[in-house]
């Protein structure tokens, strides 16, 4: 869908988004890569340039990194500059995931495209090992020209996907409707770049052109403000220690973060109206019976 937003309106929109950043933990301090993360595979495909980390994909391998800790509730953010030029067939991912078959997962997947065509951002939510909740949108800027922040806010009421502090998706807690919600499995934070030309670009019709390799994604501004969960602590104990009580209060349990503010709701409506290109909730060919959460989600 083409956006009708003019440049002055877009600038005003961005300034408004920044003014609301603190409401979603937007004042987080960033850390060096090695304070929070570590390479998880293809160590020779990492390049460090001061505060910037670069991961590359070539016809030998992609690369990936993971957080040193696991977390239950809070906010994670990274600034990414995506692969420039012809990125068809490539996927750069930033996500949170727990372990095991019945895992929970929140995904940003950036689907590359041919030169001049926009990146697609695919988000997905897995709960107890069940995904198939894809949404796709294009962005209101070129994500290959500069760094932009991508964040996940997670509390007991909602999961919010954000781009430059603008919400692009909300997955609400609907347990009162009998719909499971991810709230008891600590998650690691991950990113990777890999070849997915069997599906990533135009349904797999456009393949990766290896003559343009290496494909490089750049990272900076690593930030995690969340409840870290020691591996030796039981899941029920983690859920208790990461939830607010009379003795302790966590910022992510603030009543103002139990749902989007009015302004943030308007932002999300704008994103969906101007940039959403696919929503599993409306894909009746794939889901003849509407998924249960789609009947109740307001966004």
Swiss-Prot record:
GO molecular function terms attached to this record: hydrolase activity, hydrolyzing O-glycosyl compounds; xyloglucan:xyloglucosyl transferase activity
Active-site residue list: 105, 109
Subcellular location field: Secreted, Cell wall; Secreted, Extracellular space, Apoplast
Main location: secreted
Enzyme class of the recorded protein, top EC level: transferase
Cellular component GO terms, alphabetical: apoplast
Influence of pH: Optimum pH is around 6. Highly active between pH range 4.5-6.5.
Tissue-wise expression: Highest expression in ripe leaves after full expansion. Also expressed in fruits, and at a lower level in flowers and stems (picked at anthesis).
Binding site for xyloglucan: 109, 122-124, 132-134, 198-199, 203, 286
GO biological process terms on file: cell wall biogenesis; cell wall organization; fruit ripening; xyloglucan metabolic process
Entry EC number(s): 2.4.1.207
InterPro entries: Beta-glucanase/XTH (IPR044791), Beta_glucanase (IPR008264), ConA-like_dom_sf (IPR013320), GH16 (IPR000757), XET_C (IPR010713), XTH (IPR016455)
Site note Important for catalytic activity, residues: 107
Signal sequence region: 1-25
Catalytic activity: breaks a beta-(1->4) bond in the backbone of a xyloglucan and transfers the xyloglucanyl segment on to O-4 of the non-reducing terminal glucose residue of an acceptor, which can be a xyloglucan or an oligosaccharide of xyloglucan
Tree of life domain: Eukaryota
Family: Belongs to the glycosyl hydrolase 16 family. XTH group 1 subfamily.
Protein name: Xyloglucan endotransglucosylase protein 6
């Amino acid at each position: 869908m083409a956006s009708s937003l003019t440049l002055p309106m877009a600038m005003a929109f961005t300034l408004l988004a920044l003014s609301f950043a603190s409401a979603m933990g937007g004042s987080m301090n960033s850390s060096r890569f090695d304070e929070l993360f570590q390479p998880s595979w293809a160590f020779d495909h990492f390049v460090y340039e001061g505060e910037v980390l670069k991961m590359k994909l070539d016809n030998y391998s992609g690369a990936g990194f993971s957080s040193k800790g696991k977390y239950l509730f809070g906010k994670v953010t990274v600034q990414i500059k995506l692969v420039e030029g012809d990125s068809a067939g490539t996927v750069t991912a930033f996500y949170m995931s727990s372990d095991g078959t019945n895992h929970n997962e929140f995904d940003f997947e950036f689907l590359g495209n041919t030169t001049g065509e926009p990146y697609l951002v695919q988000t997905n939510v897995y709960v107890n090992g069940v995904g198939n909740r894809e949404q796709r949108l294009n962005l209101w800027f070129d994500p290959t020209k500069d760094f932009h922040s991508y964040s996940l806010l997670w509390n007991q009421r909602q999961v919010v996907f954000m781009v430059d502090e603008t919400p692009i998706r909300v997955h609400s807690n609907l347990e009162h409707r009998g719909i499971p919600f991810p709230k008891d499995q600590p998650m690691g934070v991950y990113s990777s770049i890999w070849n997915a030309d069997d599906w990533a670009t135009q349904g797999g019709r456009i393949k990766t052109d290896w003559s343009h390799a290496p494909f490089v994604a750049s990272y900076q501004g690593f930030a995690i403000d969340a409840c870290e969960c020691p591996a030796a602590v039981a899941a029920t104990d983690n859920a208790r220690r990461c939830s607010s009580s009379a003795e302790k209060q966590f910022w992510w349990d603030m009543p103002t973060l139990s749902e989007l503010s009015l302004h943030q709701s308007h932002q999300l409506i704008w994103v969906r109206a101007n940039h959403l290109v696919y929503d599993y909730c409306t894909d009746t060919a794939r889901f003849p019976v509407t998924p249960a959460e789609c009947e109740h989600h307001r966004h």
